Curated annotation (Swiss-Prot):
PANTHER family: UDP-N-ACETYLGLUCOSAMINE 1-CARBOXYVINYLTRANSFERASE. The active site is at C119. It comes from the Bacteria. The keyword Cytoplasm applies. Pfam families: EPSP_synthase (PF00275). The gene is murA1. This is UDP-N-acetylglucosamine 1-carboxyvinyltransferase 1. UDP-N-acetyl-alpha-D-glucosamine binds at R95, R124, P125, I126, D127, L128, D307, V329. Its EC number is 2.5.1.7.
Amino acid sequence: MEEIVVHGGQRLTGNVHIEGAKNAVLPILAASLLASSGQTHLSNVPVLSDVFTMNNVLKFLNTKIDFDEINKTIDIDASRQLSSEAPFQYVSKMRASIVVMGPLLARLGHAKVAMPGGCAIGSRPIDLHLKGLNALGAEIERHDGYVEATANQLHGAAIYLDFPSVGATQNIMMAATLADGITTMENVAREPEIVDLANYLNQMGAKVTGAGTETIRIEGVKAMHGCDHSIVQDRIEAGTFMVAAAVTQGNVLVEDAIAEHNKPLISKMREMGVTVTEEPAGIRVIGPEILKPTSVKTMPHPGFPTDMQPQMTILQLCAQGTSLLTETVFENRFMHLDELRRMNADFKVEGRSVIMYGPTDFNGAQVTATDLRAAAALVIAGLVSRGYTEVTNLKYLDRGYFNFHGKLAKLGAEIKRVDVPDGTVYALNPDFANEAAE
């Protein structure tokens, strides 16, 4: 069993490099299925388990993929005859796999995709995806754990999303690129990853306007082709390291981080007394000796991102006073708090809100990650804990962070990823930090 072991108490200093965005590259990989000619070259691709999973989905669909993990590039040839069925063994591992449905339906007129899996944080139904595809003219059936969509020719439509779902916005937008006529989507997701997908689609020959606003307009085209595209930087990874720097009273330059993409987080951190400055090379974060309490409510973009909620709770628990966090996006995203209670966190959950009483004198403990962002939050808690913290169930961490422990070690954390037998308490030796940074 692999686990991350942290010896808390070290101040983080230095520079940290941010990868391409997981939440951008996955739908862009799916969108490559729309290219009936030419090849696609993607750069700044993060080396994550979710990327390997999506690559396997595309390979099963008969695309040719070459992933250069050293240079972080992917070359894709989707011009061949494609299969229209995405099987359970791949899709069940990752929720984002459902976004292959729109591209397959648009290009082949048929898509059969297993119901998605991924992190267990709320029900996250795909009804909005199917409602939008149905509006474009697809016939939808659900059976035997699969969703099957069929359409001789998709046609443009006026679509209003009941909720600005990121996945539904992506799926419908991709399907509409090859539809006959004009599609107008209202109340859509506005995340930077939506803008990155739209930019990629336009480079492929699509006609998409309005991405990043509440209304997206897509004029259907006859065919699309491969292109070159660089994945946008990961705002959630950037935010995670910003919180880690702040909570350890550190001084860290988060390289290539885009301040515009993290405005809600930056605003709240400044409210808590954290110094956050934009520099030509990225965002610098300097943590204060005393953090002020604050209230946070997660919202769809441009509100505070739900993917930063678990990490933010660590910052709030370290604040001197009472903080409040309300989760409005997912109904079950406080599972990491039970693990933090084992580390001496004091809080009270009331419905979709949690009241946190700080400052917390975190104790090291063995804790288990329950989802991707919870895993990162537990590691950050370990950075400010007395003694040793062991974080297990790292499969979640690997879905969204590349070399997380190594990057923290280079910033000065005493942290290491180890393979130990079940039940073993790992003891750090004096050379721990040096070994971890290698």
